[in-house]
Amino acid sequence: MKSLGICLGASTVSMVQAAQENTSGTERPRVIDFSRHPHDGNPKKTLLSVLNSLDLTSFDRIAATGRKFRKFINLSSISEPESVEHAYGYVKRQGISCPAIVSAGGETFMVYVLD
């Protein structure tokens, strides 16, 4: 299964492509590619430009996140805290205890306290 994650931020459009060969849940997805694109105040133009450079039919899932701009597109979306929590589950290394995650964006600085 191949997935595309899009973050529509205050100053950039970021994307990550991930793949998971075994969908039974025993294998973690692996990052295939990622990119960041400054949108200079025009996230729609930047998003369309980046999407036009991809073969969207090659993705089984596409989802977007972002505080404000994700609400203006017709894609499945999740909140930033939910996406951060989900992603952290895949990148956390065993034996590492992390009390919080910092999300430092173009306009918003957030600290997510983990329990």
Predicted regions and their residues:
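Gly/Thr-rich phosphate-binding beta-strand-loop-beta motif of the actin/hexokinase/Hsp70
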Residues: 1-27, 98-115
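N-terminal cofactor/phosphate-binding cores enriched in small/glycine residues
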Residues: 15, 30, 50-51, 61-67, ...
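Electropositive phosphate-/nucleotide-binding environments in soluble metabolic enzymes
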Residues: 9-12, 40-45, 78, 82
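Conserved phosphate-binding catalytic cores of ATP/NTP-utilizing and phosphoryl-transfer enzymes
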Residues: 68-115
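Short amphipathic alpha-helices and their capping/turn segments at secondary-structure boundaries
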Residues: 3, 52-54, 92
